[in-house]
Amino acid sequence: MTTPHSQAQPGLPIDPHPDEYKVAALVFYSCIFIIGLFVNVTALWVFSCTTKKRTTVTVYMMNVALLDLVFIMSLPFRMLYYAKGEWPFGEYFCRILGALTVFYPSIALWLLAFISADRYMAIVQPKYAKELKNTCKAVMACVGVWIMTLTTTIPLLLLYEDPDTASSTPPTCLKISDIIYLKAINALNFTRLIFFFLIPLFIMIGCYLVIIHSLLHGKTSKLKPKVKEKSIRIIITLMVQVLVCFMPFHICFAFLMLGGDENSYNPWGAFTTFLMNLSTCLDVILYYIVSKQFQARVISVMLYRNYLRSVRRKSFRSGSLRSLSNINSEML
């Protein structure tokens, strides 16, 4: 299916996105924006303002929520692009949002690796439990990852082989749709795959294997059952999030780089990008497990909504009864 904007014009780039993709992207990003904004604003407020005793996990969660919000705030521009069928915000802003597509999972995976290492310390090395309260080291680790990721993302703003040219009619921003355009700089991309996917992935796998071995062989008998249960829930949540959201994205990324030179719409690239973006909402499970304050906030919001519904029902019923009594009085 083609649109007026996707019809070929001599000498001009073609917008390769089907109408079905644009509709799906609009619906998907609208849901992600609404849910993700509420969840992560609440989480950032809870972890930064209401948590009295901060630990290393609290620091990591604050960074996860902040990273999610940075990414979520770019979604309205994507939605407007798909709705209008053209890019009205200029070439450089398009490059920034395209770079953000790779910037987000790079930091997210390292933060998940930090949380995994934290749970390793809590379960396997409880004698170093004091280190879990050393928030200064956690802050330094997070700052280091942000700086390292920014440094390796800046070259994406300087692409010399750009699918979106200034003469495109209508203006396009193919870079935010999927990751196929990144094949122009494969040397940097393979380096990014190693440092921002494989290394944090191996850290997580190593931590999980040692934790499982310790649990199976009874080497964690000194730990409280609640600590074990909480750590196991965190580990399961992290594993599911990595397997569902980040693994397909990076596998597709690698195959696209090893593929041919054709720079066209790739449904798998777009689909795995959707899955990666879904992580901004799935973090709510992690927040809920880690923080009792976040649990209380979510429960209070749900109770307040139930209260409003009950008030509306009562007002509706009372209004109906009043109208019936008025009708009866008029008939009499």
From Swiss-Prot:
It is a multi-pass membrane protein. The chain crosses the membrane at residues 27-47, 57-77, 96-116, 139-159, 193-213, 234-254, 270-290. One of its GO terms (cellular component) is cytoplasmic vesicle membrane. PROSITE patterns: G_PROTEIN_RECEP_F1_1, G_PROTEIN_RECEP_F1_2. Keywords: Cell membrane, Cytoplasmic vesicle, Disulfide bond, G-protein coupled receptor, Glycoprotein, Membrane, Phosphoprotein, Receptor, Transducer, Transmembrane, Transmembrane helix. InterPro entries: GPCR_Rhodpsn, GPCR_Rhodpsn_7TM. It comes from the Eukaryota. G protein-coupled receptor (GPCR) that plays a role in diverse physiological processes particularly within the immune and nervous systems. Becomes active when triggered by various endogenous ligands including endocannabinoid N-arachidonyl glycine (NAGly), delta-9-tetrahydrocannabinol or resolvin D2/RvD2 derived from the omega-3 fatty acid docosahexaenoic acid (DHA). Upon RvD2 binding, facilitates the resolution of inflammation, aiding in tissue repair and homeostasis. Belongs to the G-protein coupled receptor 1 family. This is N-arachidonyl glycine receptor. The gene is GPR18.
